[in-house]
Amino acid sequence: MGASIDDYSLVHKNILHSEDLLKYILETSAYPREHEQLKGLREVTEKHEWSSALVPADEGLFLSMLLKLMNAKRTIEIGVYTGYSLLTTALALPEDGKITAIDVNKSYYEIGLPFIQKAGVEHKINFIESEALPVLDQMLEEMKEEDLYDYAFVDADKSNYANYHERLVKLVRIGGAILYDNTLWYGSVAYPEYPGLHPEEEVARLSFRNLNTFLAADPRVEISQVSIGDGVTICRRLY
């Protein structure tokens, strides 16, 4: 039986349905560790019309920890929005780290740019205003062995995640990580049907159900689907 839209709150882009527990996590663990410029960017983004696309602060800390544990230096980000996850990545990378960041809307990136500049990490970022697929295809054509990436983070058009995966599994080195955001889609992926969603949300929900099944069966990666934010799937490239 399908779930009603009333069963889950879509107010917060978070798989954790206890608002009290979420508030506790953010106020106890996340916000005290949040970089000053990340806090400023978050507060500005929360006032934006598409604020639901903001990566939560606890997820940001998770991404930062993973990047540091991996000693990542070269990363790809597909879907930037105002740049919260991008700034998180730039702060986590070493001084000579490099990020290729791709988004169709530079105006959103420019909202976050002053915070990136104040944090002193703009030099790590190569922002490309474009659809991602042609950029990834060009990168594959020009790629040399030493150009492989350590890490990729995808938070963009949901119906294209599988297409991005086919390219990223070649662009990211063996042992590197590819992360997909929103893969639990408010918890709605657990149900064959989920009445009440807007048509574009339903398209995304079905795309994620298909993606989750596909990634679980992909022998090129090992995966872990983490219940943080709106669900993050980590893929480690095996070959």
Curated annotation (Swiss-Prot):
Cofactors demanded by this protein: Mg(2+)
Pathway(s): Alkaloid biosynthesis
EC number(s) on file: 2.1.1.336
Residues the entry annotates as binding a divalent metal cation: D155, D181, N182
Annotated S-adenosyl-L-methionine binding sites: V55, E77, G79, V80, S85, D103, A132, D157
Transferase recorded as keyword: yes
Temperature dependence: Optimum temperature is 45 degrees Celsius.
Segments passing through the bilayer: none
Alphabetically ordered keywords of this record: Alkaloid metabolism, Metal-binding, Methyltransferase, S-adenosyl-L-methionine, Transferase
Tissues showing expression: Highly expressed in bulbs. Detected in leaves and inflorescences.
Catalytic activity reported: norbelladine + S-adenosyl-L-methionine = 4'-O-methylnorbelladine + S-adenosyl-L-homocysteine + H(+)
pH dependence comment: Optimum pH is 8.8.
Family matches, as InterPro entries: Cation-dep_OMT, SAM-dependent_MTases_sf, SAM_O-MeTrfase
Function: 4'-O-methyltransferase converting norbelladine to 4'-O-methylnorbelladine. 4'-O-methylnorbelladine is a precursor to all Amaryllidaceae alkaloids such as galanthamine, lycorine and haemanthamine, and including haemanthamine- and crinamine-type alkaloids, promising anticancer agents. Can use norbelladine, N-methylnorbelladine and dopamine as substrate, but not caffeic acid, vanillin, 3,4-dihydroxybenzaldehyde and tyramine.
Record-stated family: Belongs to the class I-like SAM-binding methyltransferase superfamily. Cation-dependent O-methyltransferase family.
PANTHER family to which the protein is assigned, alphabetical: O-METHYLTRANSFERASE-RELATED, TAPETUM-SPECIFIC METHYLTRANSFERASE 1
Name this polypeptide is given: Norbelladine 4'-O-methyltransferase
Organism: Narcissus aff. pseudonarcissus MK-2014
